[in-house]
Amino acid sequence: MSKSFGKIKEYSFPHSYSELPNGNIISTFQTKGGINTVGGIVEFSPEGKYLRSSDAEVDETIFMRPYGIVLVPKLNKIITTNYDMHETGNGYHIQIWDMTSLELLQTLKLPSTKDLIIDQNPFEGRLLADGETVMFQTFSCG
């Protein structure tokens, strides 16, 4: 990348970046518009030119702040985690996106347990050697 930025279009608070198979960059942006509103993912050129974006908002009842990003090229998917750097709420979901269109395909709630807080604030994910399985940590080390 040849320049730095803090905002692209209406998206702000960029967090994680990854290089797409086509050479472009995909990034999670925690917010869109005002402070601490639901963000999304943004694709831009290696030179930093905005290309397209997709919102992470599902509905008002689900607290989403895109954080980590994992590419799964074998399945043409992008996985994003949900952790709020402003610490105004807790995330309990991950999101699955189509890598080609950036369409948000699914928002999945993490499983919870009665005695442990293992579903709170998923953050950094990793693609395993099979090229299909993604594992991620949660704030409570779940």
Language-model region placement:
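Conserved GH/AH loop at the N-terminal boundary of individual WD40 repeats
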Residues: 57, 110-111
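Structural signature of WD-repeat beta-propeller blades
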Residues: 15, 67, 92, 123-124
